[in-house]
Design a protein with these regions (language model features):
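Bacterial N-terminal signal peptides
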Residues: 8-20
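Alpha-helical cap/lid subdomain in secreted, periplasmic
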Residues: 6, 50-66, 70-171
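Short Gly/aromatic-enriched secondary-structure transition segments
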Residues: 46-47
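N-terminal secretory signal peptides that target proteins for export/translocation
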Residues: 1-3
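Catalytic nucleophile-elbow at a beta strand-turn-alpha helix junction centered on a G-D-S/GDSL motif
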Residues: 28-42
Length: 171
């Protein structure tokens, strides 16, 4: 599992520069997902989307990252609210591919792969670039006592590891 995650990240970072970049003046970025996007258990300014926005600003990328995470959301829920959560003009979506599926599996709901495929197809159909939220087994040591949600440091690690892919997507 760790090997697969590392391989996914390695391949993603290799191809990121080859993918279409978005002009910074037109960049609107939306992070969508469940509680680890929303920042459950930490302040909104400590959630990874806000930290990522700050890191982008420090690198001279003055873009806004909208946090459209909802604690307890499922992939079906994300699909249902996709058009309102990701407004017209959005160029990049940072997609939590795990949290919503975890919530639904825990409740015995839906076909997670089909729902994720539908989310991605709808976003691509609108010309929106998708960057998956970074996950790694190393994050386990940065979870709150509930064993599910990131600590502030966990959020910082997610933002730090997503930064290169997002930097490659906005110029």
């Amino acid at each position: 599992m760790v090997f697969a995650a590392r391989l996914f990240l390695f391949v993603g970072f290799l191809i990121a520069p080859m993918l279409r970049s978005v002009d910074i003046a037109q960049a609107q970025i939306v992070a969508i997902g469940a509680s680890n996007v929303a920042g459950r258990g930490v302040s909104s300014s400590d959630a990874w989307p806000a930290q990522l926005e700050g890191m982008l600003a420090a690198k001279g990328r003055n873009v806004h990252v909208t946090n459209a995470g909802i604690s307890g959301d499922t992939n079906a829920g994300m699909l249902a609210r996709l058009d309102s959560a990701v407004p017209q003009g959005t160029k990049i979506v940072l997609l939590d591919r795990r949290g919503g599926g975890w919530n639904a599996r825990r409740r015995g709901m839906g076909d997670q792969n089909a729902e994720l495929a539908a989310i991605e197809a709808r976003l691509r159909g609108r010309g929106i670039r998708i960057i998956p939220m970074w996950w790694n087994a190393a994050l386990r040591q940065y979870l709150q006592p509930d064993g599910i949600h990131f600590t502030v440091e966990g959020h910082r690690l997610v933002a730090t590891n997503m930064l290169p892919a997002v930097m490659g997507a906005v110029r």
